[in-house]
A protein has these predicted regions:
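Exposed, low-structure sequence patches enriched in small/polar residues
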Residues: 1-168
Length: 168
């Protein structure tokens, strides 16, 4: 059950009215063995979506290029039919992780969503400087791809997080 206190815009010109909603869906998928260097999942979901229907076809994969470098591509296509209108949303993303040492890595995630026409990127560095204590540096950026020319900046941020484990 999901309750919306106010209307919720899900796509350009399509909003879901306030109110309570229940969902039922059926899903089928095929998973390739995660123990292999190349693995993945293909799936399909069909079911209710607020006052309408949703069909999703998705793929997610994992490729261990080397012992230190891994890529995880994924794509999801949703066809949504609602009383207020129909739309298709495609979300494509790729995650890459490069392990510098057993105690540090650099990871990046790039994602595109067609319904909002946005692309976002997130780059994260993690260093465990002693067991249980970490330093994270994260750079994030989101851009609107709908106007002509270069994608317009929506948001940008840098976060530094420092944790320290105290043992008693």
């Amino acid at each position: 059950f999901e309750y919306l206190a106010r209307p919720f815009p899900v796509a350009n010109g399509v909003s879901i009215p306030a109110g309570g909603y229940t969902f039922q869906e059926v899903q089928t998928s095929f998973n390739a063995g995660p123990q292999r260097r190349i693995a993945g999942r293909v799936g399909m979901t069909r079911g209710q979506f607020f006052d309408g229907d949703r069909t999703e076809v998705s793929y997610s994969g994992r490729l261990e290029a080397t012992a230190s470098l891994m890529f995880e591509p994924a794509v999801s296509v949703n066809w949504v039919d609602l009383p207020a209108g129909s739309f298709r949303n495609t979300v494509a993303r790729t995650r890459a992780t490069f392990t510098l040492s057993p105690r540090s890595f650099v990871g990046a995630l790039v994602q595109y969503a067609s319904a909002s026409q946005t692309v976002s990127a997130n780059v994260r560095f993690r260093w465990e400087y002693q067991p249980g204590s970490d330093l994270f540096v994260v750079f994030s950026e989101g851009r609107d791809t709908s106007p002509r020319g270069l994608p317009g900046l929506q948001n940008r941020g840098v976060v530094v997080k420092f944790t320290r484990l105290f043992r008693f």
